[in-house]
């Protein structure tokens, strides 16, 4: 009879991830799933990651990609709708991470408790004719609510913020954390990796190279003219004609619009954004692990310019963005672009600050 009891207990544990009512508090009482180092079943110790907005266009693909990451031992999937379905689907993948789903505002705290990394793609997507700033009124409130949960339940977690407009939502998150007394500028990271991925891809097309061999620093922000690719600093070192510079800069800045228009109302850049978010999250996890020289571009608190936040290359480590790199030498085209970017960014950042301080 004891064997049957143990079997029933194991079955209950395996199916628990499909029940949104299953909480970390319940987990702690369980001698197997509540192990101190949070091992995945049969796996190695890893990190606890939460995705807020896991059932959305970006969130579903991102959930799949993070389930595949060997550095993740526990993956919490949260959304206000459809979280159980995404959780069940992703949980059938035979990779090491244990997956649990959380549904609705009442379970936000359970989804966040004890997390090492929180990724936030939640919010409404862009539609044809919309700019990222058009999303502000809806997404600003969503980010505020979710970051209040982070401040309460996992104040030491690294936060990867994807929700647009990133140029404003990072400032919103910072103000929420300041109010809660938990703000650590090194741990709040706006995800601009897709701008870099696009830059690498488009530049590689012009140069006839594999995109994996190309590195283009992209600085500034994450919308329109605030996205500034530094083509003078491309690796491998390359030269471009004025027309190529104009073409590449415009295409990189308008990459999101290109996808929105191509999908003709059926969505935005969800797949490439999920890829970029997973790539950046992996870099953050490698930094947390203590890997050396983990360098990515991110929109962070910065003293590189007079603005409070700015996207540049950063070195990721155990405490987040441990080093923020300077811009380096710019050519005249880039200096003009930088001034345009800063002017636009200043208003977007202030808009986020005012949303919380109003």
From Swiss-Prot:
Gene: MDH2
Record-linked Gene3D superfamilies: Lactate dehydrogenase/glycoside hydrolase, family 4, C-terminal (3.90.110.10), NAD(P)-binding Rossmann-like Domain (3.40.50.720)
Name listed for the protein in its UniProt record: Malate dehydrogenase 2, glyoxysomal
Known EC number: 1.1.1.37
Binding sites annotated in the UniProt record for NAD(+): 53-59, 79, 139, 162-164, 273
Family annotation (Pfam families): Ldh_1_C, Ldh_1_N
Top-level taxon of origin: Eukaryota
InterPro entries xrefs: L-lactate/malate_DH, Lactate/malate_DH_C, Lactate/malate_DH_N, Lactate_DH/Glyco_Ohase_4_C, Malate_DH_AS, Malate_DH_type1, NAD(P)-bd_dom_sf
Keyword Transit peptide annotated: yes
Subunit architecture: Homodimer.
Residue range covered by the transit peptide: 1-38
tRNA processing listed as a keyword: no
Chief location category: other
Alphabetical keyword list: Glyoxylate bypass, Glyoxysome, NAD, Oxidoreductase, Peroxisome, Transit peptide, Tricarboxylic acid cycle
Residues engaged in binding substrate: 126, 132, 164, 198
Cellular compartments annotated: Glyoxysome
Family the UniProt entry places it in: Belongs to the LDH/MDH superfamily. MDH type 1 family.
GO BP terms in the entry: glyoxylate cycle; malate metabolic process; tricarboxylic acid cycle
